[in-house]
Amino acid sequence: MSLASSLESLRKIDINDLDLNNIGSWPAAVKVIVCVLLTAAVLALGYNFHLSDMQAQLEQQAAEEETLKQQFSTKAFQAANLEAYKAQMKEMEESFGALLRQLPSDTEVPGLLEDITRTGLGSGLEFEEIKLLPEVAQQFYIELPIQISVVGGYHDLATFVSGVSSLPRIVTLHDFEIKPVAPGSTSKLRMSILAKTYRYNDKGLKK
């Protein structure tokens, strides 16, 4: 059958005459057209499904790419600053170690007690007590509490406190208590104070 005759037969076909329950009785040209349409529909659906799947994969890969870019940027920044960070940490450790080594050793503590006593006597005070209390160990240093009790005038006490704070070694003052020596008299005052100096703890630093 020629193409012209096929087209002519299609024009003569009434769709209402086609029996859906008996597709085999349909004209050959109609069968071919239906097959072509069904094939095209199947291909279109499959192509659309494939495109949707590819789109989802592309979006997932794009998100993963963005995450990898951020990770790379962070690691690149860390790598660029790693040497500077190491140098800074080394400098801090050296400075901290140097500061700790300025603390008095065991052999220097008696000299510190002499300095405190000399400062008090030079301020016009009378010592009632100056004694070392039990040590308190910390990680990098050891506290050496010193209980001090002195008697003198108000300005003499102030001069003593200022002098102790100015000593070359680190000394901190705590728990001030000032009372008149005689009830009702302010000419002589008794001051009890806890001084703390700090000894270098080389064992703690090595840890």
Curated annotation (Swiss-Prot):
One Pfam family name is PilO
Question: What's the effect of swapping M92K?
Answer: Reduced twitching motility and hyperpiliated surface pili
Give the chief site where it resides. membrane
* TM region(s), chain numbering: 26-46
Q: How does it sit in the membrane?
A: Single-pass type II membrane protein
Mention one GO biological process in which this protein takes part, according to its record. type IV pilus-dependent motility
Print the keywords alphabetically: Cell inner membrane, Cell membrane, Membrane, Transmembrane, Transmembrane helix
Deletion phenotype, per the entry, is: Deletion mutants lack surface pili.
Q: Which GO terms describe its cellular component?
A: plasma membrane; type IV pilus
Q: How is the quaternary structure described?
A: Interacts with PilN. Interacts with PilP (via N-terminus). Interacts with PilM.
- Briefly, what is this protein's role? Inner membrane component of the type IV (T4S) secretion system that plays a role in surface and host cell adhesion, colonization, biofilm maturation, virulence, and twitching, a form of surface-associated motility. PilN/PilO heterodimers form the foundation of the inner-membrane PilM/PilN/PilO/PilP complex which plays an essential role in the assembly of a functional T4 pilus.
Q: What is this protein called?
A: Type IV pilus inner membrane component PilO
